[in-house]
């Protein structure tokens, strides 16, 4: 049962990776990247299966969420600064 959950989560992560590559909008890409980080942290927790695995998954998830938020904030600020007036 556990192996099947890891495989299903892996398939979801691969699908999110493909959708990230095919997405046209930056905001859409960031959503898919965030979904990938959820899946990867779940795979870490399921694969290790101990308390240390839960700690690893939590640290990975928090770090990837902070990174995604920093990238989104930077892209938002760059988008505001790139307004060209005629």
UniProtKB/Swiss-Prot annotation:
It comes from the Archaea. To M.jannaschii MJ0526.1. This is Uncharacterized protein MTH_386. It comes from Methanothermobacter thermautotrophicus (strain ATCC 29096 / DSM 1053 / JCM 10044 / NBRC 100330 / Delta H) (Methanobacterium thermoautotrophicum).
């Amino acid at each position: 049962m556990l192996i099947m959950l890891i495989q299903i989560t892996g398939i979801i992560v691969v699908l999110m990776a493909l959708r990230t590559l095919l997405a046209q909008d930056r905001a859409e890409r960031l959503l898919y990247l965030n979904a990938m980080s959820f899946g990867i942290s779940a795979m870490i927790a399921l694969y290790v299966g101990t308390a240390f695995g839960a700690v690893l998954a939590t640290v990975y998830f928090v770090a990837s969420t902070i990174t995604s938020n920093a990238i989104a904030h930077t892209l938002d600020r760059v988008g505001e600064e790139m307004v060209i007036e005629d």
